[in-house]
Design a protein with these regions (language model features):
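A structural motif corresponding to the C-terminal lobe/cap of the Radical SAM core domain
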Residues: 3-8, 12-203
Length: 209
């Protein structure tokens, strides 16, 4: 799922072939740390329409230890500015509900997204896919059963975590965009909208109006 996990030489050869044989606008997905000015310039010349980028989590230590992504938040922010410089539209994909995550750790994902000038951003629920280390961790810690299946990234969490309940995960997920886009002095109001109650739903509807 990382289009730029290839050498610069191969990208240049692919770009020449693409412009010669296909020459249509396209979308691709990669990670922020694969971006360079040279690579984005090549993609722009190829006719890129937009990009999707996996940020996944905003806490630097959690991202390194749990996701094995040893890249600083500062570098991620700076790398994404390259897309803004070349006027390439992009979306940032985030995940909530990882094993061992807390609400405060998840708020770091919101904080880093507030520093990124993406034209769209998404938050998905963690999915413990078969064959992944995080699924093994979830099973070892008793957060899921061995036969647990996930049907969709948009499905509610299947993890049972006392420190970060399914309701709390779902509430933060639905309020992700308001937290990123609205002023911080409205955060107390947004927090109320995390609750799936009559009051919370009413506030949520007013935020999205």
């Amino acid at each position: 799922d990382t289009f730029l996990a290839l050498s610069d030489k191969y990208l240049e050869e692919f770009a020449d072939m693409y412009k010669s044989d296909i020459n249509l606008p396209f979308w691709c997905q990669t990670r922020p740390e694969t971006l360079t000015e040279e690579r984005v310039s090549i993609l722009k010349d190829m006719g890129i329409h937009r990009m999707g980028l996996g940020l996944e989590h905003g806490n630097e230590e959690f991202r390194a230890t749990m996701l094995d992504r040893k890249v600083s938040s500062k570098k991620i922010i700076e790398d994404l500015k390259i897309l803004n410089h070349f006027d390439v539209k992009y979306s940032v994909n985030n995940i909530v509900g990882f094993p061992n995550e807390t609400r405060e750790l998840a708020m770091d994902t919101i904080r880093i997204n507030r520093q990124i000038n993406a034209d769209t951003r998404n938050m998905y629920t963690f999915s413990p896919f078969h064959g992944t280390p995080l699924r093994d961790i979830a099973i070892q810690q008793g957060l899921i059963e061995k036969d647990t299946l996930v049907k969709s990234l948009s499905s509610p969490t299947v993890l049972d975590m006392p420190q970060f309940s399914a309701s709390a995960i779902g509430g933060l997920k639905r309020c992700f965009v308001p937290y990123v886009l609205l002023e911080k002095d409205r955060w107390p109001e947004i927090k109320k909208a995390e609750s799936f109650t009559e009051e919370g739903n009413t506030i949520w509807e007013s935020l999205m109006a």
